[in-house]
């Protein structure tokens, strides 16, 4: 799991049927965690731009979304209210 900040969103008008109704957000990992690539993650918790989030990846992302058959690589599974050394 990684910690990141929501920096934008992606609109997809055509997608797999089991992804319809999901919101896609762009997440930037926290620089202090040494991860420098932005990712697109399915948002199941209603995160907003600027919020710090928890992102599950791989099969954990699919299970976290409640759809183990969906073609999902990353999912926002939590919003961080507070934490130490996050920025």
Which residue stretches match the model-derived regions?
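N-terminal first-folded block
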Residues: 1-32
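A generic local secondary-structure boundary/capping motif
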Residues: 14-16, 42-44, 64-67
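A structural micro-motif recognizing beta-strand termini
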Residues: 30, 42-44, 58, 80
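Short alpha-helix capping/helix-loop boundary micro-motifs
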Residues: 37-41
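C-terminal structural segments of small proteins and small subunits
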Residues: 54-87
